[in-house]
Amino acid sequence: MNLDGVFVESDDEKAALASAHGNRSLEAKGSYNTLDFVVRLRPDLHKVLEAQGGEISMRECDFWDVAQAFSTYLHETIHWWQHVGTSAGLMLSFLQPAHAHMNRKWLDDVLATHGPVKPLLRLSEKLSDAEQPDGALNLVLNNWHDLDFFQKLVINPVGLVKRVAEHPYFESVGHSYRMAIGAASWLIGATVDPNYEALPHPRDWEADMEALRESKAEGFYFGSPIEIPPLGLLEILEGQARFSQIQYLYGASGGYLSWDDFRKRGMLDGVYVCAFETFLDFAEEGWPATVDDPIVGLFLLICDVALSPSEGLFLPMTDPSSLIWSTDPGWRFIFLCRLAKEEGRGFKRSIQTYSAEEYWEVSQRLSDLLLSPSPRQFAEAVSRYAETHPAWIQLMEEDRTFEYREGNFPIRVLLGRFTRVQRDKLTAPQFFCWPGMCLTSYRQALDSETVRSLFSEHQALFLDRADRDVYPRLVPGKDEKTLQRLLDDFYIWVSMYEMTRQWLVEDGPFDYDYGWLTSKFSGAEIKDWADNAFKVGTGVHPDAFSVLR
């Protein structure tokens, strides 16, 4: 079972295994999956929240079960923000679509040469055994593996580096990271900036990458030693979500709950605390006395900055030799922790009021020391593109109405949401960095009206309900038919991406397990739906495929 890209909220690490894509027996309290873009809650938590009449008092909860249920929803909503509101998460969200979009021409060539056969990985092995290599097929599979290596090294470097390093398709860390940035850039460019009039072009630093390979710079050539950070994106994302959740519960209790209370509830174990403990180690700090201690605020800010690499994607790549360290969230996190330590104890205690001013000041200082564009520079650049570039202006109008053009549909949806986060972050960065402190009145990090407006705007687009089916989130002022059409159109594309993945690398016939999406249609109806989407995308019906053994 592949759990890459599954992010869960659980008091039991074993329960997380039940929340993988396609498994309807959800035991964890909640989950968010990079492949299906759905925020899920356990049915009993849905019932608790639904009993509030759809209106959750985020600032004052009279009952612990309501506060706890909402905190789980907040935890999973933060995973949505991480994936559509940060550059690291956006790249992760774009990996599966990239296989279908960027390989389109070469997949057509493979179909023309070999006909409809699956999986292409098995076809490549047979051609290799017969010493009949196919250039287009090799490009498709090289692209697949490069992006897969990036995902593995970024999410779980410690657990997966050996598997990646020993894979026959693996060239180098730098190459995989370059391909991932290029794939995301290509999707964004094709959607809003096809001539790269605003965005930096990946080819601008192509020659530098070749020079690094030829000079055998570490990390950029075949056979190079691989240095990995002690943690990956998984630990950072779960740590950020869990400690924000804990701060919310702390504030909702009026500051009554202690660390021991959260430990007794199983909220400070395993993957959920790994990033925080790593931060304390590298920053040379002891465990803070209270949940709202400045050290906790600094940890969450470092998570935020670590998830915001921008060079090569939205801003020019200034030093290609630092590509790995400037892109990888795990390395960024470690370097930021070290820099915070070097700045001294006074700096580490800068977050006193959890204000926008503190966020900008501390994030700018750390970014300057990291020699990296700051979150403000990043957000300003994206906002500038969205305000001055005609195609991006059009996209933001689509995002406002939730009525999107057909081409690159999921890319338009995700990029529109990403841009909206960056715009709103310029006015209220503390909401996205310290949501737990903003969602209660305990520390009053942000006024109530602004908090409600921002939380309403940035909840996930797609949620499950107690029956486990997926529904569009109801948005005030938006027609329900428009929102349902958004969901329908979005998941037509998602099904095509999944079928393309199976075509490339999955043994056996096509699998039509879409029970994670809906239980309201028969297996035959679901198959027809997925088959039609795939045929529109590829020109070939799945039933025409021969399965290689």
Regions found by a protein language model. Give the residues of each.
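Short linear interaction motifs
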Residues: 51-63, 209-227
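Post-HExxH zinc-binding segment in Zn-dependent metallohydrolases
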Residues: 84-157, 235-253
